[in-house]
């Protein structure tokens, strides 16, 4: 609209007013599943198996004001919305020690500009080990992306999609907790 543009005496644009507009409609549906099972043995300790799985069935918005709803589930129309996402883990606790192996999964999704192309699914493994030094002190060693897996290529995001993957690759940290 002409009132959204300000020009100088020579006709050059000096200000462009861009305002967000409420599209007013969004339909979202999905399924979340969370399972957890704990096994205890007096000699071996505790083993906890856990799994969380999410499936986006529909994520629909209009592409422009007055347009019909477009389903963006499994695409990056409205930001990256993979249909599948999951985290599974196994935690073993024995005495003052505990260790967890975690598998993180993000499903593939189609490119909004080229629906015949997609960003590949991505999964990583993380390992965490903790030692309860005293009732007040705990030391934890964490390795994220244990296999140093690279984020999948996404040409629409200048290389990779930072909302779905971490560019750092393998990352280790040491955490010390002390409760006063």
Question: What is each model feature region?
Answer:
Residues 100-105, 112-128:
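Generic long, charged, amphipathic alpha-helical segments
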Residues 21-23, 115, 145-148:
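Asparagine-centered polar/low-complexity signal
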Residues 42-44, 120, 134:
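A cross-taxa feature marking solvent-exposed loop/turn segments within ectodomains of secreted
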Residues 26, 93, 122, 132-134, ...:
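A short, compositionally biased micro-patch
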Residues 1-109:
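Gram-negative outer-membrane beta-barrel transporters
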Residues 29-33, 84-88, 123-129, 170-174:
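Hydrophobic, lipid-facing positions within transmembrane beta-strands of outer-membrane proteins
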Residues 1, 65-72, 107, 116-120, ...:
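Flexible, surface-exposed loop regions and adjacent strand-edge segments
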Residues 57-60, 103-111, 130-180:
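C-terminal beta-signal and adjacent terminal beta-strands/loops
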């Amino acid at each position: 609209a002409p009132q959204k543009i300000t020009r100088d005496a020579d006709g050059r644009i000096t200000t462009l007013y861009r305002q967000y507009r409420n599209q007013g409609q969004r339909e979202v549906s999905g399924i979340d599943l969370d399972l957890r099972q704990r096994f205890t043995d007096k000699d071996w300790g505790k083993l906890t198996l856990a799994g969380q799985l999410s499936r986006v069935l529909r994520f629909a918005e209009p592409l422009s004001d007055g347009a019909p709803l477009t389903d963006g589930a499994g695409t990056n129309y409205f930001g990256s919305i993979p249909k599948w996402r999951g985290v599974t883990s196994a935690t073993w606790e024995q005495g003052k020690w505990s260790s967890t192996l975690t598998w993180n999964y993000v499903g593939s999704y189609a490119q909004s500009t080229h629906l015949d192309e997609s960003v590949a699914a991505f999964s990583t493994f993380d390992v965490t080990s903790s030692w309860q030094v005293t009732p007040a002190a705990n030391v934890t060693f964490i390795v994220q992306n244990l296999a140093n897996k690279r984020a999948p290529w996404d040409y629409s995001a200048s290389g990779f999609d930072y909302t779905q993957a971490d560019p750092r690759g393998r990352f280790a940290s040491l955490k010390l907790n002390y409760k006063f």
